[in-house]
Amino acid sequence: DVNLQGTINLCAALEKVGAPRAFIFISTVAVYGCDYGVNITEEYPLNGTTPYAMSKRLAEEYLQNWCRKYNVVLGIIRPSLIAGPNPPGNLGAMITGICRGRYFSIADGRPRKSVLMVQDIANLIPLLVRKGGIYNVCDSYQPTFRDLETLICKQMNKSLPLSIPYWLAKGMALIGDCLGCLLYTSPS
């Protein structure tokens, strides 16, 4: 797991060359485990249960202990959906899915998503180097998924994706999760 094991490996390497003054970790709002969220503060319980959310939460916990031990200023940023050139994560997967014709809109794309530009995150990092702390970061711009789909389709010269009902998407996800558990074999 890159988030936790990569963090542990990086800290071990830093111990050999000397701990830095500050460490900035880009986490995720997924650590809260909410399908939706309004006014979620940094004190909100960390209930994320997906492997991604859990790995980020465990990496945060590891860093909090490590930074305390080595007297390092720790800044943790928990961003929403990150946008920019070659976006990572869910937005990148959405773009790829639309381009390949393997993306379905859910519930007519009505849900909204806070979108944060990667440059905005970059602008925060120098501030956190001095101050540290944990910060949820989002933008006031909260387009619907249909807005995002329309923009992507227009830029990629693709047709808007077919929309499926929420209950069907949830059922398909559950079946996929079950199959994943049945078919997954641990690396030896």
Regions found by a protein language model. Give the residues of each.
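Conserved Rossmann-fold NAD(P)-dependent oxidoreductase catalytic core, especially the SDR/UDP-sugar
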Residues: 8-51
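Active-site Tyr-X1-5-Lys
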Residues: 49-74
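Short-chain dehydrogenase/reductase
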Residues: 49-57, 81, 114-115, 142
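Substrate-positioning beta->alpha
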Residues: 87-93, 107-129, 136
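Mid/C-terminal beta-alpha module of Rossmann-like enzyme folds, strongest
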Residues: 128-182
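Conserved small/polar residues in nucleotide/adenosyl-binding loops
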Residues: 184-188
